[in-house]
């Protein structure tokens, strides 16, 4: 199949066949929050200016890949009649917002999103629908009358891989890829990653420094398959999360970003977390991690998964700890195993598992300035020291693989010993754990389970590349997923900036996904504004990394915006920006009138000192001289 076959047809599409009467609803017990949810619905349905949702059809009608089409104004051709214009073609951008930004879709959070992948999963014929939940805790929650008013009402029976010859079945995208199968998910991703580049008129781009990465000019379904088969990329798509739109994480693809949300014992609610999730995906979050540690973790997660168009990750040890009333020493393999099954049956797409925290590494943290800062890492370190043996995450790792391959849950192997300050970076504990994660990666791959590796943390700029180089070496090119890293510790309230500096660098060096940091990092639970600020900051970092790598087509949006800037097409400048609302707001603070949107100056320079206007005059003068 050629690229024209993959993504030549753009259509508007109505993926939700609900009527407008099915407006956004909230749980009946929460009527007091109706107004806020309706406000959220208006925010989500409000299409960005000059934009429309389009769907690119693949090789079959049920492959409809969403993108945002930005319409651009024409450019007046200088020196000729005012009726002469240069047409600027529409620009297409990657879109993570799901049907929430489709004006034709009726959104009902109580019913969840359409099951985009259900048909693909079903047609493979290697899964079965269970009679009911098989997790003891899941069953107990379903019978708990006290939480009935919190529960998502439309829960399907879970799917699981069919057994093969008496052995546990395998339905991972890695399993298919290694058998030469190109799944609909892989074709969907190829269209999504390519972003209609074959229609771009300006592909001028500086050569990047790839540090060994290799991305072809056009990403094909076969390239996606080969990268997944090699373990260099993952497609986090649990079979029980059919609502999710396929995406890929790997250093030969666009750098992705993850947004952390979740309640705590001190704040937030199910409504607020769902609102944060939809808000984060609107602004570009490729993945969401639910890090809830407060009340109703099970119910919160169900609402998030059923309404999320992007993969959802969790740290299962958090909920397991809740089940033993916060006493880490009381954790057992049986409790953790049941938690994994509970979450896999809900549809969690990837688990952070801190299996690399070994007993021998814990004493190495004694001399650290900030000790063990990972919540999961500290929990497992406490368990190991109390019981004086290796954690059940490590000793039962193959059992965990057996569970995950039945649902296609990917590993995000957690860096439980990551540094919490610059002083502790790149020490023996951190790198010892990383080497162990490399060994566990090979075990997971033996089971055809997808793996990515988590990384730091707090690292000075001159020490960042050492992290990337070692990860590639000991983890055999498995995707790296890092929290920043923060490049200085002196800026609480601005750690979205301190970390974005490190994120841009490590993304350039080869990290596949960046975990965002909000301005509230180290200070408190982020609200919706903080979530947006973190997302936009990390979209900048990820894009800067793509540019530095020379990712094909990465510079096209920069070129389009720069052209609009030089031609004083103010509306196009706003609309091509990562955050059109803020760009327009800042411009209009001093030049609010409609006439100012065609002015050949801004309030920075005024009408007489605009360098771009002067440059245009110089060019016109030069043309006149040449004509003579």
Swiss-Prot record:
UniProt lists compositionally biased (Polar residues) regions at 1-14
Q: Which InterPro entries match?
A: ThiC (IPR037509), ThiC-associated_dom (IPR025747), ThiC/Bza_core_dom (IPR038521), ThiC/BzaA/B (IPR002817)
Cofactor(s) this protein requires: [4Fe-4S] cluster
Q: Which Gene Ontology CC terms are recorded?
A: cytosol
Which terms does the record give in the GO molecular function aspect?
A: 4 iron, 4 sulfur cluster binding; carbon-carbon lyase activity; zinc ion binding
Where does this protein have compositionally biased stretches of type Basic and acidic residues? 19-37
What Pfam families does UniProt report for this protein, alphabetically?
ThiC-associated (PF13667), ThiC_Rad_SAM (PF01964)
Indicate which residues the UniProt annotation says bind [4Fe-4S] cluster.
Answer: 602, 605, 610
Per UniProt, where does substrate bind? Answer: 260, 289, 318, 354, 374-376, 415-418, 454, 481
Could you tell me which pathway this protein works in? Cofactor biosynthesis; thiamine diphosphate biosynthesis
- Identify its protein family: Belongs to the ThiC family.
The record's annotation in PANTHER family points to: PHOSPHOMETHYLPYRIMIDINE SYNTHASE, CHLOROPLASTIC (PTHR30557:SF1), THIAMINE BIOSYNTHESIS PROTEIN THIC (PTHR30557)
- Give the quaternary structure: Homodimer.
Name of protein: Phosphomethylpyrimidine synthase
The protein's organism comes out as Psychrobacter cryohalolentis (strain ATCC BAA-1226 / DSM 17306 / VKM B-2378 / K5)
């Amino acid at each position: 199949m050629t690229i024209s076959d993959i993504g030549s047809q753009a259509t508007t599409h109505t993926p939700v066949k609900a009527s407008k009467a099915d407006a956004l609803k909230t749980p009946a017990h929460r009527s007091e929050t109706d107004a806020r949810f309706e406000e959220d619905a208006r925010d989500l349905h409000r299409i960005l200016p000059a934009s429309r949702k389009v769907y690119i059809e693949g090789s079959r009608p049920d492959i409809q890949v969403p993108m945002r089409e930005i319409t651009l104004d024409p450019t007046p051709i200088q020196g000729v009649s005012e009726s002469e214009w240069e047409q600027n073609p529409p620009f297409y951008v990657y879109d993570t917002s799901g049907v929430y930004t489709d004006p034709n879709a009726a959104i009902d959070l109580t019913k969840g999103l359409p099951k985009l992948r259900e048909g693909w999963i079903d047609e493979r014929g290697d899964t079965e629908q269970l009679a009911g939940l098989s997790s003891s805790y899941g069953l107990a929650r379903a019978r708990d009358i006290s939480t009935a008013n919190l529960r998502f009402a439309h829960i399907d029976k879970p799917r699981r891989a069919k057994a093969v010859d008496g052995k546990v079945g395998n339905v991972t995208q890695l399993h298919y890829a290694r058998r030469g199968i190109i799944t609909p998910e892989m074709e969907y991703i190829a269209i999504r990653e390519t972003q209609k580049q074959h229609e771009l008129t300006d592909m001028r781009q500086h050569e990047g420094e790839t540090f060994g990465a290799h991305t072809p000019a056009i990403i094909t379904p076969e390239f996606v398959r080969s990268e997944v088969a090699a373990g260099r990329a993952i497609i986090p798509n649990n079979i029980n999360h059919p609502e999710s739109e396929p995406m890929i994480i790997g250093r030969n693809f666009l750098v992705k970003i993850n947004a952390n949300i979740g309640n705590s014992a001190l704040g937030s609610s199910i409504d607020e977390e769902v609102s944060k999730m939809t808000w984060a995906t609107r602004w570009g979050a490729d993945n969401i991690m639910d890090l809830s540690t407060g009340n109703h973790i099970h119910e919160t997660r169900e609402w998030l998964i059923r309404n999320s168009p992007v993969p959802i990750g969790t740290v299962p040890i958090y909920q397991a700890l809740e089940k033993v009333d916060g006493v880490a020493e009381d954790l057992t393999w049986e409790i953790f195993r049941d938690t994994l099954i509970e979450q896999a049956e809900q549809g969690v797409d990837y688990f952070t598992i801190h299996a690399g925290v070994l007993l021998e590494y814990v004493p190495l943290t004694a001399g650290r300035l900030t000790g063990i800062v990972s919540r999961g890492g500290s929990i497992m370190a406490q368990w190991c020291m109390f019981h004086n043996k290796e954690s059940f995450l490590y000793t039962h790792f193959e059992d965990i693989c057996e569970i995950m391959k039945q649902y296609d849950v990917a590993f995000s192997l957690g860096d439980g010993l990551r540094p919490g300050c610059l002083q502790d970076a790149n020490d023996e504990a951190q790198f010892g754990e990383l080497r162990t994660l490399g060994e566990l990666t090979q075990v997971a791959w033996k089971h055809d389970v997808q793996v990515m590796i988590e990384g730091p943390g707090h690292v000075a700029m001159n020490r960042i590349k050492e992290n990337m180089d070692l990860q590639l070496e000991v983890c055999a090119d498995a995707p790296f997923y890092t929290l920043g890293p923060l490049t200085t510790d002196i800026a609480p309230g601005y750690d979205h900036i301190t970390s974005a500096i490190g994120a841009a660098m490590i993304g350039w060096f080869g990290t596949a996904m960046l975990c965002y940091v909000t301005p509230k990092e180290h200070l408190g639970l982020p609200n919706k504004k903080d979530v947006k600020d973190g997302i936009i900051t990390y979209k900048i970092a990820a894009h800067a990394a793509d540019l530095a790598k020379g990712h094909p087509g990465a510079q096209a949006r920069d070129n389009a915006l720069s052209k609009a800037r030089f031609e004083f097409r103010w509306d196009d400048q706003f609309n091509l920006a990562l955050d059109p609302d803020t760009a327009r707001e800042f411009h209009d603070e001093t030049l609010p009138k409609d006439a100012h949107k065609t002015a050949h100056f801004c309030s920075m320079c005024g009408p007489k000192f605009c360098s771009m206007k002067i440059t245009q005059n110089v060019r016109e003068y030069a043309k006149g001289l040449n004509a003579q």
